[in-house]
Each structure stands twice: as structure tokens, then as C-alpha cells.
Amino acid sequence: MTLRETIISAPGIDASPDENQCPSNVPAYIVSREQFRDAARMMKTADARLVAEWATDESHYSSLPLPSGEREGVRGRGFGIYACYARDNEYLIVKTYTPIEDPTFPSITKKFAPAHRFERQMNSLMGVIPTGHPDLRPWIRHEDWPEDAYPLRKSFDASKPMQRVKGEYNFIKAEGEGVYEIPVGPVHAGIIEPGHFRFQAVGEDILNLEERLGYVHKGIEKRFESLSWTEGVKLAGRVSGDSTVAHSLCYCRALEAMTGCNPPERVLWLRALMLERERIANHLGDIGAIANDAAFAFLLYQFSRLREMLLRINLKLFGHRFMMDRIIPGGVIIDINSDGK
């Protein structure tokens, strides 16, 4: 039984197809807020995995008629709650809606462990509340953010600096004889990005490790709202410099799905070539870094040399070491012949 058949035939779940879903080969079904967790249970029973969970502010649609497939009472014209599931090569999106005056929805963390951080992030940035979540401490939002600051809400004004306040993050505490804490970060030696790690230990035995991230949250998602498509793809390509091809392609594929644009086959092959070269370069760098963490510095030097050779070939083929800005909505900006010219 497919995931689509599972959600349609699930007892006690009234799921209706979202006929406006893009891309059309990833079906989406709308359920009531009360049935959102039941749908997760059915996906778990079907051996599906949770790919992602996110929220959207759809309050600005309140004056528009309901789209096809969405029933009165199901869509509250407030926040959209989405969960994407996968099994093998099949994907399915389950969505529900929660009103602005009561932005709650049933947590699916107890069904799918990865939802734990997804839902904490949704709570931090959108202000929706996953009821039944075991840990609703702020994840992305830091203690100097005002209580009512939710950057991904449409009402949030990103044109001026956020007013800062005083606050304190409540780390998990371990108590007992001989228990001590080791704080690491958020500033580290080297060039890695910031992150705070709180170790609790007895002797050399680690009892608990808690990560505190989000120090480089830049408001990128909010920034996309004010950009044109051509500006947006440039921003996407700068989310992570060494993964610029992957991020640019994701942005372009989303636009192409919404507009029904089908790039030519040659464009698809050129994009695939750039993706593979980016993947190989990053794997070479990562393997070398892993070896270096185990004090095998010589292997790091060798893999770094191979990675540099690959990046120099990228420059010759595509005009940029990391192939930044080579992918645009609907196509690519560069072509190569069989001689690589």
C-alpha cells in the first residue's frame, strides 16, 4: 500500500487532497488539526520517515476564498502546519491549519524523534505551539529576543533592528556527587561556526551533552520575502558558500514547479554535473577533516590537495571555483562543449 493509499484509507482520518500542491508529483493531503498526530501515527505504521516539518504564516490569505480541496473549519486562515514523509522514493505531505488566536497543534515528536527540533524551531520563529512537546525551550530564538518577536510572521517588521532584552537560557542540570559541567563555545578555535556545547560529566563519563545553536541566524528566510526571483537565487547561493550549487538549485526547482517551467534536458545534465563536482569537493574536504580530528594530518593535506585540484578545474569549466551564480531559474548561465570549453 502506498503512502497516499495509507492516508486515504486510514480509519478516523478525513484527508482531502490539496489540488494546489506544487510539485504535483509530491501529493499533499489536508487533515483537521486534531487528526495531525493521528496521520503521523499512520505514517509511522507504514514505515515512513519524517523528512521535514515546518510552519507558514497564511494570515494574509484571510480575505481570499478557500482553495480547492480545503474545507471550512479545517483551514483557520492563520498558520499552516506541514509534515513531509517519505518511504523509499515516495513522498507525501500532510498539512493542517491553526488559527491566529489559538496557534496550537498536536506535537508529533513522540512518533518521530526528528520532529523534536523541527517543532522547537517552528515555535521559536513562527510562534506556533506544539502541544505535548517534551521540551519547548527556545531553540533558534535567543534569550535577548523580546517575547513577542517571531521573525517569520508576516507582521514582523524586519526593516529595523530588533529591540534587545535581558534573559537567560535554562540549560538542563545534572546533579549528584562528583557531577561537573564543561562549557565549550560558542566561539571556537579555527574557522568553524559558533555553537555552545554544555557537557555534564562524572570523571570521564559524560552524562549529558546539550547543544545551543542559532548564533548565526541571519533572517535569510525573512529576507527572501522582499526579493525578486533573480535576487532570491543569488541569496540562496550564498546561504552556504561551499554548497552554493545545491542551494541555488533547490530555489530554482521550487520556482520552476510553481510556474510549470520545464528546463531543457541539457540544462538538467549541466546542473547534475555541477552538483556532482560540488559533492565530490565537499566529500574530499570532509574526509580529510575527519582524519585530522583523529590526528592524521597527512591525510588531511592529501585530500585538501585533491579538493584544490577539483576547484581549479571548476574555475576553468564554469568560470568560478565554487560554481556560484551558474544556476538560474529555468536554466544555467554557462555551457561547455565536449572539450570542456
What are these regions (language model features)?
Residues M1-P67, G76-D205:
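Terminal low-complexity/charged segments
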Residues G69-R71:
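A short, hydrophobic C-terminal helix/tail in secreted or cell-surface proteins
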Residues R87, F112-H116, L125, P130-D205, ...:
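Catalytic cofactor-binding cores of redox enzymes
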